[in-house]
Structures are given as C-alpha cells and as structure tokens.
Amino acid sequence: MKMLTRLQVLTLALFSKGFLLSLGDHNFLRREIKIEGDLVLGGLFPINEKGTGTEECGRINEDRGIQRLEAMLFAIDEINKDDYLLPGVKLGVHILDTCSRDTYALEQSLEFVRASLTKVDEAEYMCPDGSYAIQENIPLLIAGVIGGSYSSVSIQVANLLRLFQIPQISYASTSAKLSDKSRYDYFARTVPPDFYQAKAMAEILRFFNWTYVSTVASEGDYGETGIEAFEQEARLRNICIATAEKVGRSNIRKSYDSVIRELLQKPNARVVVLFMRSDDSRELIAAASRANASFTWVASDGWGAQESIIKGSEHVAYGAITLELASQPVRQFDRYFQSLNPYNNHRNPWFRDFWEQKFQCSLQNKRNHRRVCDKHLAIDSSNYEQESKIMFVVNAVYAMAHALHKMQRTLCPNTTKLCDAMKILDGKKLYKDYLLKINFTAPFNPNKDADSIVKFDTFGDGMGRYNVFNFQNVGGKYSYLKVGHWAETLSLDVNSIHWSRNSVPTSQCSDPCAPNEMKNMQPGDVCCWICIPCEPYEYLADEFTCMDCGSGQWPTADLTGCYDLPEDYIRWEDAWAIGPVTIACLGFMCTCMVVTVFIKHNNTPLVKASGRELCYILLFGVGLSYCMTFFFIAKPSPVICALRRLGLGSSFAICYSALLTKTNCIARIFDGVKNGAQRPKFISPSSQVFICLGLILVQIVMVSVWLILEAPGTRRYTLAEKRETVILKCNVKDSSMLISLTYDVILVILCTVYAFKTRKCPENFNEAKFIGFTMYTTCIIWLAFLPIFYVTSSDYRVQTTTMCISVSLSGFVVLGCLFAPKVHIILFQPQKNVVTHRLHLNRFSVSGTGTTYSQSSASTYVPTVCNGREVLDSTTSSL
C-alpha cells in the first residue's frame, strides 16, 4: 500500500509540474461544471472548437459541444429522479472542455485523477486528540468518465485513466485502436469501431463501381486509423487509391487549399473518401468551394448529417454520401434543451457564449458592436436540430449508472445508500465485472427491438449500425435524406439519391469500356486498364475476358452468353432458288414434250433410225438431271443428301452412257464399212441397252458403296470469315462430291473422243456430228463450271445456283443438239420422215481387205444409225 502511495505521489509530482506549466503558458482560466454527488462522473466534451495559431480554443461548438454536454446533464437529472436506478444515490458531475485537441484534453483530464493522487489515508493521519485530519479542497472522487468525443482525445485520456483504474465510456470515439484491450483495458464505448464504418464505405464504393478514389484523413487516431481500415477493405474489393492526403493539426487554410489542388491532379478520381473530424471536413469543403472544385464526397460520421459542415458551401457538398451511426432522436431531450436560456441555465458556464454565437447578439450592452439579445429569444424547431450522437451520450451515462447500480446491489445488499465498500471504488472490478456485462434497453427509445439494446462486446465496443445519408436540394432547400443503412450488409434506395450531375458519377482509373470491350489490366495495377474490343463472335465471360462462342454460336445482344445461330440454307422463295427452279421446270417441260413426241411417233422411220431405246434412256437421264435442281435447293436432310449423292452422278452416267453407246456403235459400223470387216457385234437394240445399263450400273455401284462407307447426313458449317452464318449442308466435302463425278468425266471424255473420230462421216449422214456438238458444248460448260464452283466456295448460294444451272444447261445441250432437230422434222417436216432406200447388213461380203456391195450404187449409200435390222438412206433422214 505504501509502495502504491509513493508511486502515486511521484506520478502527481510529474503531472502537476506539467500541468502548472501549461497553466502559465496559456494564461489559463478554467471553466468547468462541478456538481457534487455520492458518486461523480467525469465528462469530456469538445465544447469549443480547436483554435487557430497560438489559441488553444476557438469558437463554441454548438452541436457536438453544447448539445452533448447538456445531454449528459439531462441524463444525470433523469437518473437522479429515477426510483429504480441507483435509488438513494445521487450522481454528480465534473465536466471539462477538450477544445477538440488531444493535448489540451490530457491537461484537463489531470483534474479527474487528482482525487486519487491526493487522497489521504485517514488511518495514518490522526490529530493528537484522536480525531481524523480535516481535508480541505478535496477534489471530487471520479467513479467513471464519459468521453471524449474525438478518438485522439479518448486515446490520450484512456492512457492516463488506466493508470488509476478509472473506467471510461466514449459516446463518439470510433478508432479501431481503442479495441485493443491490452492497451486500453478500462475503455468502453457506445459506438462501434471504425472498421465497421470503413467496411460500409468500401461496400458503397463497390456498389456504385467506384474503383479509383482519393482519400483525405485528419491527422490523429480517428482519421489515420479509420482511413487505414478503409484502405484494407478497399484492397479486398479491388478499389484503388489515386492519392491519399492528410490534413494536419495546424488548421491553416493553405493546407486545405493544397489538398484540393492535389485532388484535382487526379481527374479520373471523381469520388473522394473523407475520414475527417467535423472541423476539418468543414474547412476542406470550404476550400473546394474556393477552388470551384466538384467531387462526389463519401464521408464518415465525422461529417455525418451536420448542417454546420456544409454551411455556406452547400453547392459543393451537393450529392455527397455520408454515414452516421444509426440512432433514434431522444424527444425528451428536445423538450429539455428547448426550455433552456441564459436566464435559467446557470450551471453551464459556456451557455451564455453559445447563446450569443447562435443568435448573433450580446447579453451585455453592445459588446463587440453586437445588438443586445432579445429576452424573448428561444431555441425552437426553426433553429434547432438534435445532434446525431445525443442518444449515445445518454446511453453512455446510463451504462455507467447501470454498472454502478449492479455493483451497489452486490456490495451493499442491505441498503440503498452507499456502503463503505462503495466509498472507495474498485475501478477494475467495476469495469470488468459490471460495466462490460450490462444489457438494458436504451432509455427514451420508443422502439423496443434488438436495435434498442445497449450492451458491449468483449472488446467494450458498441454494435455496428449506420445510416446512409445523401445531401440533396429539394425545392431549393438543402437537406440530408436517409437513403439506406448498413448492418453487416448494405441496403440502398438508389432511386432516392440525387447526384450533382443528375447521373451516377464514374470514378475509375480508365474510362469505362464499351459493351463489346474487355478490360486489359495494366501490370501491377488492379484499377487501370485499356479497352480491347472483343471479336464479333466472342462474348464477355467477365469484364476481363472475351470468350469464343464456338462454331455455330453467336453472342447475345448484351454479350453475356451465346445462342445457337439459326441454320441458313436456300429457301424456295429466295431469288437464288427461283432462277434455277424456273430453268429446271422449263427443261423438265421440254423433256416431257420430247418424250411425248417420240412416244406418239414411236414407229416412224426417224424415231426408229435414232435408236429409240437409247433415246428414251437418254431422255430419262436428262429429266433426272433437271430433278437434281430440286434436290439441291431443298433443305438438306439425310434423305435429300442421299438423293443428291445418288442422283447427280447417276443422271450424268445415264446420259453419257447412252451417248457413249451410240457413238461407239457408229464408230464401229464405220470402221467396219471402211475396213470391209464383218458385221460388228453387239449393235442390236437389246445389246446396246444392256451395254448402256452396264455402264450405268457401274456408277450406281460406286455411289452405293460411297453411301455405305459414308452415311448421308447433315452438318452445320461455318466459314472462318463468316462466323455469323451457319450453313446447313450435307456431310460431304465439295471435293468428295466432284470426285464422285470422276466416272462421268471418263464417260464424257470417251464420248468426246468417239464424236471426234466420227466427225468425217458423209455430210448428209450427220447424227455423229450432232453428238460431237453436244459433247464439245458439255465440255465447255463443265470446264467453266469447275473454276466457278471452287471460287464461290465461300458463298454456298452462288455455289449451289452455279451447280444447278450447270446441270440444267447440260440437259439443254442434249435436248438442243440431239433432239431439237428430230422434233423439228417430226412436227414440221413430216415429208422427210419416210424410207426411200434400204440396205440390209446381210448383203455385206468380205473379200480381201475391203467390203463390197452387190449393187453398183452401194457406194452412195452410207448407214446413218446403228440398227440391227436395217440402215436407212440419208435421203430418208438427214439425221
């Protein structure tokens, strides 16, 4: 005990020396409120703002100072009148001004510990007559302290009070440092630590996608630790800090102007996050007004919903988003405060200064050239609005009272007065066993819900709940409007928010990318990017990645996904289809007409001489070639694809097999006549039909094997240069389709060779010549078709149309060169369709190397066509 006393005396000496020096330095005249009681609570409030230059204290702080001070007095009055809370115990107060400075607050707080340092043990000091020593000017013994306001003040005071085990409850200090119980083990607060607020602010930025912002913090624990917590939360959400500024304690206008100039150096950081004390916030907004700078402010509860901060600079603050601790107004305090005036409030030595400042008048005769205050002036709803932390001041006083009440009930169970065990308070026991365990419903709160419960967590912190305000101009009047709240999660009414430029501002290092662009982040920087356009066939998997939709798919309009492209193919109503189909129909009609004419005149000499069996086969092939146009225009399907593969080669094989059989027959007959050979074999109609069918069968077998090895089907085909179009095609390559015509090409070549060999037939015996014309023209068509087919491979419409027209032209060549002359004679020159001379093949005789005829005129008769029974004179038919 003696060792402790010596330590306390030593501490007193050290503090007293510094304290007396400070008094001398500042010509100090103490203002304080001292109201005696059984238990006394200390109070620290920023009644004056910090001064400028050499002055410690500045103007009266109307809201954070006077209102909060009166809130403590109001709470003390209510508790002393309460019959259930500390009945029989009167609470007193000792309230001091901090002048919004931590160093000044520390000097003031020495008054709270003087009682502990100067307390004399009565048992050790007695008078000779046995009586105890009389102690004069004994300082009030402080049971606990309510305050301070700023975190820097509370930290300094907490370091002092912990030495003397005096519990402390703050109503506004939110620095995260104060949650460290190893250093601030007698500190509690009715407000949450700043890291909750920092998290809420970061979530607001992320909500509006503000990823590149500037920050300004007040020097000291509130601003520095708050902005540090915000930066940690910002990093977790990929939010970058463009520039981080700090406002010192000098409170010089130039420093605020300098900060604004620095903020303007980052034009893309349109949002500025403020973790500042109220006076610093006011000066910064004023500096922005002087510079005519426009920012979107996101401010902590240091700004909150205070009118004094934006007074005179409302246009600069318009659109600001501010946070304020969630609280309910104490209506009973409104009535109490509005009843005060300088004539009935004598216990508050600062109230007269407050009154003069608020109403811009003087309570003395024309002091400072001001008008004399009217005695009818009053505080009312037109000039008063309850400060946002009044509830927390009241809750702090009641929390201390509830802790003392429980301690008194425990230590003094048989009395409502203070027993000896309570006269010397054990601060450690009061804090840990009672204060941290209190749990009660906030007084004067009409809502009896979970949000109205007052309690502390294991770190002595209050619960984290915030209101979000937006500074607006409605009907020409500026005001704060609550637009959301935060309690672990953010809830915002975006439609209620007003912005300075009537739209949600952007605050990003780089300009937003267009809807079809992705962000390419710059190395080492998570907030700056360049915009790279996605390819037309890519969608945005996220804002940093363009992904290929894949073949046959295309990105949606909003580029959030892909959809299957519709299959494109030639439709019957397309111009690409109408032309080929018209040509094919015309050709098919011509073919039918020729067949009709031939059938009707089937037994006439001309039809017989033409080799009618091969003619019908040839006409069937021509008709089939016209049908191919319909197969190529039709929508691809497995059946259509099979018919295409089977029909294309087969139609040509039928035509050219018939022509090859015919030209081969002519060539063999003339070779026989010229060489005097015996009658050629296999020149009868049936033989020629079988030869022709055999040639056709080869093609059918080849195509059948092809269909078996490669089953017909469809495929979705996309050209690399035309990804937006999906073509529905048969599942064969164009090259495979042409390879399948190899056999037909061989037939064409052989036909052409035979036609060339028989080109010197007698002039009046010229069917071979017409076959030659047919083959030459066919070769020209196909030589022209092949390059066009391959060159137009990128446009399936042109390619298909070219194929259809080429096939139809091949049919027209056969009809025009071979059948048109015959039809013309049959219909318009029937006199030529007769028999005048006949030469039987059995009259051939072979002698030597030549062939002779029994008639002397035989040399003037040359067979015109292959016919196993007879050869007609050319005078019968020129064909």
Swiss-Prot record:
Glycans are attached at residues 209, 292, 414, 439. One of its GO terms (molecular function) is scaffold protein binding. Detected in brain cortex, thalamus, subthalamic nucleus, substantia nigra, hypothalamus, hippocampus, corpus callosum, caudate nucleus and amygdala. It is a multi-pass membrane protein. Disulfide bonds join 57-99, 240-527, 361-373, 412-419, 509-528, 513-531, 534-546, 549-562. The keyword Disulfide bond applies. Residues 23-576, 635-645, 710-734, 793-802 are extracellular. One of its GO terms (biological process) is regulation of synaptic transmission, glutamatergic. It holds the Pfam family ANF_receptor. It is found in: Cell membrane. Residues 600-613, 665-688, 757-769, 829-879 are cytoplasmic. Keywords: Cell membrane, Disulfide bond, G-protein coupled receptor, Glycoprotein, Membrane, Receptor, Signal, Transducer, Transmembrane, Transmembrane helix. Residues 1-22 form the signal peptide. L-glutamate binds at residues 151, 172-174, 222, 301, 389. PROSITE patterns: G_PROTEIN_RECEP_F3_1, G_PROTEIN_RECEP_F3_2, G_PROTEIN_RECEP_F3_3, G_PROTEIN_RECEP_F3_4. It comes from the Eukaryota. The chain crosses the membrane at residues 577-599, 614-634, 646-664, 689-709, 735-756, 770-792, 803-828. The keyword Transferase does not apply. Interacts with TAMALIN. Belongs to the G-protein coupled receptor 3 family. G-protein coupled receptor for glutamate. Ligand binding causes a conformation change that triggers signaling via guanine nucleotide-binding proteins (G proteins) and modulates the activity of down-stream effectors. Signaling inhibits adenylate cyclase activity. This is Metabotropic glutamate receptor 3. It comes from Homo sapiens (Human). The gene is GRM3.
